[in-house]
A protein has these predicted regions:
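A phosphate-binding catalytic loop at a beta-strand-loop-alpha-helix junction
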Residues: 11-30, 152
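Accessory, often C-terminal, charged low-complexity segments
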Residues: 1-10, 31-182
Length: 182
């Protein structure tokens, strides 16, 4: 279906009900066959698997987990079958891209300052507690990359822009190069 429906080799295919990621699998397969550079965006609510289902027994708690595993397996199978190069008939072979990123809609990764008025006898203690809670402004269950991607989204930077890790004075700095045209 993808190869028929007005698709070019650099299309972005969107699937809002991705289920087990059939569309992603098909896009990767078509790219391997014709040397295309199609990308896919799959959206799926984390619908829970029935506890009696084979998927659940295999360790998949929701449909998203099934889809991610299918994409991983599809990529691995394509590499095994086609090698790691595409464009067999092309003079210039390019590496086959089987990578993908998974994003989850969630609240901000950053703690939000509590600006409600402080009243009562222990105002200094409450203010000190609020200040101390902001020393590390990233929520405990979040990663550095969660924050990097949140900032990229807020700045309008596409999420497929490469992120580089650079060590500076024993710290990690994330470099995102994106040309903004005004």
């Amino acid at each position: 279906l993808i190869s028929i429906v007005g698709n070019t080799k650099d299309s972005i295919i969107l699937d809002f009900f991705s289920g087990s990621a059939t569309t992603a699998h098909a896009v990767m397969q078509l790219n391997a066959e014709d040397g295309g550079n199609r990308r896919f965006i799959c959206v799926q609510l984390p619908e829970l698997c029935d506890e009696k289902s084979e998927a659940y027994k295999a360790g998949y708690k929701n449909i998203c987990e099934i889809g991610k595993e299918r994409i991983r397996r599809a990529g691995k199978k394509i590499i095994e079958e086609k090698g790691d190069q595409i464009g067999i008939d092309d003079e210039e072979k390019k590496p086959l891209d089987i990578g993908f990123k998974v994003f989850k809609l969630d609240t901000s990764n950053l703690r939000i300052w509590d600006n409600t008025p402080i009243t009562g006898d222990n105002q200094i203690e409450m203010f000190t507690e609020r200040m101390n809670s902001m020393i590390d402004s990233i929520k405990d269950d979040r990663t550095d990359m969660d924050v990097v991607y949140e900032v990229m989204l807020k700045m309008g930077v596409p999420l497929d822009v490469p992120v580089q890790y650079i060590g500076v004075n024993e710290k990690v700095v994330y470099k995102v190069v994106y040309k903004v045209v005004h």
